[in-house]
Amino acid sequence: VDVFEPTVGIPNDGGDTHGDLDYQGPSDTLAINWEGNDTRDISFYQYSVGTTPGDTNVTPWTNNGTATEVVITDFFLTHGITYYANVRAYDMAGNMSSVESSDGNTADLSAPTVGWVNDGLGDDETFTPSATTLEANWDSFADTTSGIQYYEYAVGTTAGSSDVSDGWVSIETYLSVSVTFTLNETVTYYVSVRATDNVNNVSAVVTSDGITTDFTGP
């Protein structure tokens, strides 16, 4: 007679190729994977999802056969809510394992909020004597859920354009940039910045009010 409970590994939030996710962006699916730790025959696994560990208030206990991963479809995420995956195993004798819960996966459905962009490395500048260097600094972008992953900047001769930088350039999480270009006399250059959070939501673009080259002076 088999009276021993089977065992099951702690589930990971996300598909098996993604490891354990802490945050999830906009999606209509929720993926879970786990390890079947028991060396004896498992009859089936069950999974559920709740907003606290062990709870089933989002998805009730559902049979998953002997598969150790599942992608729940038509899953409605709510921004800022943390979802916990729960797993339990049954062996051939009908013994049930203890319930194991993930450490949670928080839905981040919103893009970062934007801040400001100044021309120059301090207070906003209107003119520059440099024929080769453009500088800008920015701050007050924020993402209170998954956090900001990186910033991108672009430089153009019209607000929001990137004809000088030839597209968007990633600058990690730095809050300033100093770049070398060949600048033309009496041309106004604009620096644009956008932020991407840790689930790849992208903020709106913020553009400086422009800095004009002046090589000759008074």
Predicted features along the sequence, with ranges:
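Short, solvent-exposed loop/turn segments at the edges of extracellular beta-sandwich modules
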Residues: Y90-M96, T196-N201
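Structural beta-strand segments of beta-rich domains
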Residues: D28-I32, T132-A136
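Recognizes extended acidic, P/S/T-rich segments that occur
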Residues: D22, Q46-T78, E152-N184
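Solvent-exposed loop segments of extracellular immunoglobulin-like
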Residues: R40-Y45, G147-Y151
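Acidic, Ser/Thr
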Residues: N33-T39, N137-T145
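Short, solvent-exposed loop/linker segments at the N-terminal edge
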Residues: G19-S27, D123-A131
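Flexible, low-complexity linkers/stalks enriched in Thr/Pro that connect modular domains
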Residues: V1-T17, D22, D38, G50, ...
